[in-house]
Structure formats: C-alpha cells, structure tokens
Design a protein with these regions (language model features):
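Residues on the lipid-exposed face of transmembrane beta-strands in outer-membrane beta-barrel proteins
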Residues: 65-67, 76-78, 152-158, 184-190, ...
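Bacterial Sec-dependent N-terminal signal peptides
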Residues: 1-28
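Short loop/turn motifs that connect adjacent beta-strands in outer-membrane beta-barrel proteins
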Residues: 64-72, 87, 176, 191-204, ...
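Outer-membrane beta-barrel biogenesis signature
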Residues: 23-124, 199
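Extracellular/periplasm-exposed beta-strand and loop segments of Gram-negative cell-envelope proteins
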Residues: 89-91, 128-144, 173-179, 212-240, ...
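Transmembrane beta-strands of outer-membrane beta-barrel pores
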Residues: 80-84, 168-172, 190, 208-214, ...
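Repeated loop/turn-to-beta-strand initiation elements of outer-membrane beta-barrel proteins
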Residues: 160-164, 193-196, 253-256, 312-319, ...
C-alpha cells in the first residue's frame, strides 16, 4: 500500500502533468487521499462477488458433445444462461473503523450493505471534503435471485477429432448493470485412441478455452462543491483460462455428459463512467484507476459439470449444470449443419 505522503505526491504529480492549475489546500489533498482509500476498500468488497460469479457464468456450457465428429461439421447454439445468486455473497458488513474520511450517517458503528449481486438496500455515508460536507448513498445490488442472460455459441470440426469452439454474448443490460462475455477454445476427442470405448459408445474429450468477461455496475454518485467526482460506474474485467475433461455415454438419441473444470482467472477493475466536473481541476478518475490496481487478483476455481443432450433430427436440446462455490445452469438449442 502507498504511504500517506506518496498518495498526496501522486495527486500533485497528476495535477502538474494534466496541465491543470490548482490552489487547493493541503487539507483537500489529504481528504481526497482518504476518500480514495475509502472508495478502494468499498470497491473491492462490492464488486468481487460479481466477478467471481461471472467466472461461473462463462465457464459452463462449452462442450456440446464429447464424441468425435465428422470433418467440417458445424454446430450453432442459442443459449440461455441461469446463474443462481447465493445468499452468502449478497451482502457484506462495513464498520466506521474501515474508513478514513467517511462514516455511517445514522450514528451506528457498523452496517450491512449489498454487494453488486445483492439486494436493493441502501444506507448513507457522510464525511467532510476540505471542510464541506458530502453525503454518499451506497450502491444497490441487482436484487435478483436468478440472473438470466442469452449468448451464442458455435463449434467447427477439424481434422483428427479436433474442434474449434466460440462463445459470444452481446452487451446485456441487467438491472443497474451490464454483462458481456466472449471466448474461444479447442476441444480434442480422446476416446478415438481407445477402440473399446468407441465400441461401447463411451466418449472422452479434453478442452482448453479462454474467455473474457466484462461486468459493470452503477457505483457511487458523489456530489461535492467541486462538482461530481465521476466514480458512478465500476467495471470488473476478467480473463479466464480453462481446462476441462468430459466423458459421455450415448443412449440412442441421448448423450449424457459429466465433466471436471479447472480454471484460473485474472481480475481487473476500472472506473468506466462519465468523468466528473472535478476533472477540470484534478484527474480523479485516472488516480482511482491507478489505485484500483492494488486490488487486482488471480483466483483458481474447480467445478463439476453434468449435461444431457437430446437429438431431434438436426436439432439438439441440451441442459447443463455447473457446480462448485456457485451453481450455474445453461439451456441450449443447437442446429448441426
């Protein structure tokens, strides 16, 4: 963590290189440093459960089938994803001792507030910025038990039992938030090397994928005598690298799959809303985005997956459930060319 002195130096340097004039007092620079620390603390607690959830939403439903397909077979799927929001990640507790500038307005020493995937409850935080009072309403969560979003997927069969996989979701507007995912991968059939497995209609496949998730939420709308502070939109950017093993058994027109998923995700955070009026004096959004690097993180996840796929001519209906820390379900309707 930066020392207090280093934080003020950072603000001062940004002022100089932004070409802005400033006559702000030392007290303002100190208070802004404290406010940045408070925003950083709250950002981490608020958005991390949502980015954890985004990994689950992007991780399941990659594999249509574990069996070896014919060269140049193409499958296109229209998917609806259902993420079940767990109670344990819907809220977190804050205490006055967590903050340097702000405090809970009601006079309480602690309070429970929603995460980005929590409910719509709000409280007020208050403080003084260079002697002028500020009042902040904590952000709401999406207030949904199940998050539903659509996405497209596809698979192209190449040589030697290898397939190229793609997944794409347009930017979906959820309640007080937006979500987008895209990714690609490679699947290779392993059971082709074991004739006894193929003879019994048992299939094995290994898959490697990459996906990028972008989740954005309404954040802190802070009005001050210096203008809006421009930290009203917070985004989580997640890069996920995944390995997956699947086994399946065919029963006439039904294929039942079971899989094991292991992935590693890099989490980054960024303020992406419209810059506030304070930017005419202090490049606050830039400073905060630099400080948000302090809460970047890398996490590993391990999850199971079960799936059932039913064929109706060239149309396939598939239901998938992935489970681990969270539970995520995907319903897919596919057409095979």
């Amino acid at each position: 963590m930066l020392s207090k002195f280093s934080k003020y130096i950072m603000i001062g340097i940004c002022l100089i290189f932004s070409g802005k004039s400033f006559s702000q007092s030392d007290q303002l620079l100190q208070d802004l440093g404290y406010l940045i620390d408070d925003a950083l603390f709250f950002s981490d607690k608020y958005i991390t459960p949502a980015t954890d959830a985004a990994v689950y939403q992007s991780s399941s439903g990659w594999v249509y089938s574990a069996k070896k397909r014919k060269l140049w077979d193409v499958t296109v799927g229209v998917n609806t994803n259902f993420f079940f929001v767990p109670n344990s990640d819907r809220e977190f507790q804050i205490k006055n001792s967590d903050f340097q500038l702000l405090s809970i307005e009601s006079g309480a020493t602690s309070a429970t507030v929603p995460t980005a995937i929590g409910n719509g409850d709000q409280i007020y935080l208050a403080g003084d910025l260079d002697g002028e009072p500020i009042r902040i309403e904590t952000p709401k969560g999406i207030n949904q038990n199940v998050v539903i979003y659509p996405h497209l997927s596809g698979a192209l069969s190449l040589w030697y039992g290898t397939e190229v996989l793609v997944k794409y979701s347009p930017r979906v507007n959820l309640k007080r938030s937006e979500y987008q995912v895209y990714g690609f991968g490679i699947k290779h059939n392993l059971s082709q090397y074991f004739k006894s497995l193929e003879a019994n209609k048992i299939n094995l496949a290994a898959t490697a994928t990459y996906s990028n998730e972008d989740v954005s939420f309404d954040f802190l709308d802070i009005q001050t005598d210096f203008g809006n502070l421009g930290i009203n939109r917070l985004s989580g950017l997640v890069d996920t690298y995944q390995m997956q093993l699947n086994a399946s058994k065919e029963y006439k027109k039904i294929e039942v799959l079971a899989g094991f998923i292991a992935n590693v995700s890099d989490f980054k955070y960024k303020l992406t809303g419209t810059k506030g009026a304070i930017e005419e004096t202090i490049p606050l959004q830039y400073i905060l985005n630099q400080r948000l690097k302090e809460i970047y993180k890398t996490k590993a996840n391990f999850m199971g997956e079960i799936s059932g796929r039913y064929q109706i001519s060239k149309i396939f209906i598939q239901s998938t459930i992935a489970f681990g820390k969270f539970v995520n379900s995907n319903l897919s309707v596919q057409y095979e060319f």
